[in-house]
Design a protein with these regions (language model features):
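A membrane-periplasm/extracellular boundary helix in multi-pass inner-membrane enzymes
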Residues: 84-87, 148-158, 257-302, 323
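Hydrophobic transmembrane alpha-helices and their immediate junctions
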Residues: 224-227, 233, 250, 254, ...
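Loop-to-helix entry and N-terminal half of a specific, functionally important transmembrane alpha helix
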Residues: 23-36, 377-408, 425
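Transmembrane alpha-helices of multi-pass inner-membrane enzymes
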Residues: 51-59, 393-403, 408-447
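N-terminal hydrophobic segments of proteins, predominantly signal-anchor/transmembrane helices
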Residues: 27-37, 52-124, 145, 398-404
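Alpha-helical transmembrane segments of multi-pass inner-membrane proteins
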Residues: 36, 133-160, 172-241, 246-258
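Long extracytoplasmic/lumenal interhelical loops at the membrane interface
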Residues: 288-360, 379-386
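A juxtamembrane structural motif centered on a specific transmembrane helix
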Residues: 1-27, 61-67, 420-447
Length: 447
């Protein structure tokens, strides 16, 4: 029952008909059964547990020596350690608090360390790209069904503001990311439109999730399934009403076309030249140029301007607090930004980059940027040599990094776990086959 239909990928010729490995079965069905985990309210904890558990089961020092991690994978491990270290310092500085310590541990497990586990797993267990692609395609095609059901519930006035699942209600702390929320009407481009977060806790997360699903499903080999999956991804993108995601998708597709035409090697130079010439002609700074598309959305979407202003205020207060402890940050969230009346929001709630500066300081920020850049280059080099999967992985990473400017990666990562699992399989498949030492015993004998 666990065997998928025959998949004949273009980039692998060996073992394509082999039965699924344990890791492939677990990942495949975990992705397929996403609606169940969503209704149970266990997604943010379940996905990290699955990937970290698989890595723990399959970890082998001999395999690590036989095919060591690329430096990009080590960089994500370094980022997770930096996060844990600064959090420990912060908790120690403020006085030990069990609830704060548990929250920091959970955040560590479901963010950067989970990303590391996703990228590292293919080095210890067989995780084929086409298996994750097929599962993601089925999940994304299912978006159409889920959105249709939520629209019907909206018109029938069923569900209301959603609910907190029983399992989620038993856990301590904030239940925001565990709540099941259904669709509601919201004006978008001046027209009442159905808006939903689907299986995620926040519309921008659904937006970037839809973009990444779209890019992954472009390599699905089953044409009918690919068409439904792409339609589902686009429907989810529209339902999210995420301004940044709506800009990210065409940008990602444009970059993919540049790879196809061989222009990408020269694109950065030409793009920079045209951008700054355009800025000088229009009398804009580069920052103002980037803000213009968002202003257009703000003028036509209800409450968008207020939302952007609140985000800017929180980021400003976050950076002001960071300056009091610039090198290692505060470790844990200790302050809130006052929005209006009795409404406050925790510092670091918007923008990955300001949040990392605030929590992990310059040390953590440099580590994060290094991990991002190294991961980008890990897929860029095979992409310019014609690797189609690495091309879309590169485009997906660019879209994700842009989305990180509005939403913390530590908040998004658990809902994007399938992308990181796919990315790890893509990076592993793109590595050259070189084996110098095959076991720890051989390594010890060479000393």
């Amino acid at each position: 029952m666990f065997n998928l239909p025959s998949i004949k990928p273009n980039f692998i010729t060996r073992d394509v008909e082999a039965p699924l490995s344990l890791s492939e079965r677990v990942i495949y069905w975990t992705i397929i059964l996403t609606p169940i985990w969503w209704l149970m309210g266990i997604q943010p904890l379940f996905y990290p547990a699955v990937m970290i558990g698989l890595l723990s089961v399959h970890f082998s020092l001999d395999k690590l020596i036989e095919k060591p991690f690329p430096i990009a994978v080590w960089a994500w491990l370094a980022m997770s350690i930096a996060m844990l270290w600064t959090a420990a310092l912060g908790i120690n500085d403020m006085g030990f608090n069990l609830q704060v310590a548990l929250a920091a541990t959970v955040t560590f497990m479901k963010s950067y360390f989970m990303i590391f586990a996703c990228l590292a797993l293919p080095f210890f267990a067989r995780v084929r790209v086409e298996v994750i692609t097929r599962a993601t395609a089925w999940m994304t095609a299912g978006f159409l069904v889920t959105i249709a059901i939520q629209v019907a519930m909206l018109f029938l006035k069923i569900g209301g503001g959603g609910y907190t699942p029983l399992l989620a209600s038993l856990l301590p702390g904030d239940k925001g990311s565990l709540r099941v929320i259904f669709a509601a009407f919201s004006k978008f481009l001046g027209v009442p439109f159905v808006r939903t977060v689907l299986y995620t806790p926040d519309p921008p997360i659904l937006g970037i999730c839809a973009v990444l699903c779209f890019l992954i499903c472009l390599s699905e080999t089953n044409k009918p399934l690919r068409k439904f999956a792409l339609a589902g991804a686009f429907a989810a993108l529209l339902a999210s009403s995420s301004r940044s995601a709506l800009l990210c998708l065409p940008l990602a597709l444009l970059m993919g076309l540049c790879f196809e035409s061989g222009l990408f090697r020269q694109l950065s130079l030409w793009l920079m030249s045209v951008t700054f010439i355009g800025c000088s002609i229009l009398g804009l700074t580069f920052k103002e140029l980037l803000a213009k598309p968002m202003e257009g959305f703000d003028q036509v979407r209800e409450k968008a301007a207020d939302s952007s202003g609140e985000r800017a205020l929180v980021v400003q207060r976050t950076l002001e607090a960071w300056q009091e402890s610039p090198w290692i940050g505060w470790g844990v969230i200790r302050g809130k930004a006052h929005l209006y009346e009795d409404v406050y929001i925790g510092l670091g709630s918007f923008s990955t980059y300001s949040a990392v500066l605030y929590l992990n300081g310059i040390f953590g920020f440099i580590t994060l940027i290094s991990a991002m850049v190294l991961t980008l280059f890990a897929v860029y080099l095979p992409a310019i040599r014609g690797d189609n999967l690495c091309k879309w992985a590169f485009c997906g990473l660019i879209a994700l990094y842009l989305a990180c400017n509005a939403t913390p990666l530590s908040w998004m990562a658990a809902n994007l776990w399938f992308f990181f699992a796919w990315l790890g399989a893509v990076m592993f498949a793109a590595l050259p086959d070189r084996v110098d030492v095959s076991s720890w015993e051989q390594f010890s004998a060479q000393k």
